[in-house]
């Protein structure tokens, strides 16, 4: 009786192991990458958003504000029982209109009660715009629930439902 062993050369086995390891690395990387691209929004991101939005509005920089609002953003604004919905373009035009008529302009935003859900977050917001025109001070105060979405390395306003109060002094 003869027993025959079929041994593969050790180099061939090493190549097979390496190719399987390499395939495993490629698969693991491709599964991990989307998770990294859709990073979770943090409190720091929300704080940075508020700081950036206030700075952009106070600088009257439409391009900087535009970079903080998603292209498909919708902002629903209610006042005295009437509601209107603004898209990004309408919102930016409204800001520019307020800036153009103001001899003095100020913007403040406070975000709190933030709820995080992966690459989205919702927050209560109070924004105050102070517009001085012809020595008359107008305060536009909005109380909102804002939805933020992560996009690339940025956090953007995606949706907002707002109640507006206008005070003239």
Where are these regions (language model features)?
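Generic short beta-strand segments
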Residues: 72-74, 125-131, 163-164
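Short, solvent-exposed secondary-structure junction/capping segments
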Residues: 54-55, 69-82
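N-terminal secretory signal peptides that target proteins for export/translocation
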Residues: 1-17
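Surface-exposed, charged secondary-structure patches
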Residues: 92-134
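Short beta-strand edge/turn micro-motifs at domain boundaries
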Residues: 139-169
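Hydrophobic pocket/interface hotspot
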Residues: 53, 65-66, 73, 91, ...
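Short, low-complexity N-terminal intrinsically disordered segments enriched in polar/charged residues
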Residues: 34-67
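Bacterial N-terminal signal peptides
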Residues: 22-33
């Amino acid at each position: 009786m003869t027993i025959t062993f079929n041994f593969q050369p050790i180099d061939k086995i090493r190549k097979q192991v390496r190719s399987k390891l390499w395939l495993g690395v490629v698969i693991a990387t491709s599964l991990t990458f989307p998770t990294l691209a859709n990073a979770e929004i943090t409190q720091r991101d929300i704080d940075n958003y508020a700081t950036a939005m206030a700075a952009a509005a106070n600088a009257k920089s439409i391009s900087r504000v535009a970079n903080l609002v998603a292209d498909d953003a919708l902002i629903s604004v209610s006042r005295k029982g009437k509601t209107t919905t603004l898209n990004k373009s309408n919102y930016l035009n409204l800001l520019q209109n307020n800036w153009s008529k103001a001899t003095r302009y100020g913007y403040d935003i406070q975000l709190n009660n933030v709820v995080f859900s992966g690459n989205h977050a919702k927050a209560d917001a109070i924004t105050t715009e102070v517009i001085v025109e012809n020595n008359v001070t107008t305060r536009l105060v909005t109380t909102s629930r804002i939805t933020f979405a992560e996009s690339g390395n940025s956090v953007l306003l995606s949706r907002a439902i707002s109640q507006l109060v206008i005070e003239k002094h």
